[in-house]
């Protein structure tokens, strides 16, 4: 009976209210912004469908969604993505210096609390002879992300579109190294400035005691059968249906340039390195000029960027416990599960307090800063430090 699970009842009620509020907000924004969408993205016709659930939830249940119109579909994101346009301006400036430097950033219409992006569909290469060009462009993209302090660009954040790898989420750009009194700033700086921080490159998988062993990088992450252990439904379509521990496939994403994913990457390392080197050297020379420095300042000053204190998987593992029936009976039990977050002794305890507050709403915690201030604030607008 539902009375046995008062926490579940509360969660359903709150989730329904948040969903209703978010849905009304989306429709209101669409009504106000549609003329701009018609002009900038060429939208025509009526809205036929909305697909929710693309990505994690933040900001009290808000998530990325796809809007389907008569002749097109676009991505709606409940956040300010002016950073896309700023980075695109810089990328286009560099391309004018050398036309072989191509970086595609989705066209974006950004508002203070929401944005629209063009939908980038997966377009695998028909001929493998184009792979050298693809991996040259991947090297260019890696250098771009690295030089602008990008991180957490895993396989879900990159779409292969012909000979172009296209990143579809730039909110983790312009990251700053975090300070930890116990670890030491020198070690953290060394780790931060490694190119592997971007997650675009293979990291030999994630090997943990729970059996997870998959490659998450945007370069190589693809389908793997029986990749890890987890809860699976068995005895489907019977009265004995239940969850049990079993093997789960890792589905991969749309990040590989060929559909079958069978690529001997070693053949293209030379192209990859050349792309990285070409962009790096061009950027190095441009950065000696006052014009380019002014361009960077004009486009990067005052941008809202995300701050990462933990990887998303760490939060997701805690949330998975909160979904267990045992944690739907007493709210105190949920608080005990959230206590695990305090095991990481951040020097600023306000970080963990905010993480707990956001995860009580079953959101992935999120924090922000602006490029012109030395402060961090959370999704509720609370200043953390």
Regions found by a protein language model. Name each.
Residues 156-158:
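Hydrophobic residue at the +6 position relative to the catalytic HRD Asp in the kinase catalytic loop
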Residues 1-27, 164-385:
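C-terminal catalytic region of ATP-dependent kinase domains
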Residues 160-162:
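Activation-loop N-terminal segment of eukaryotic-like protein kinases
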Residues 1-150, 164-166:
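Conserved ATP-binding subdomain of kinase catalytic cores across diverse folds
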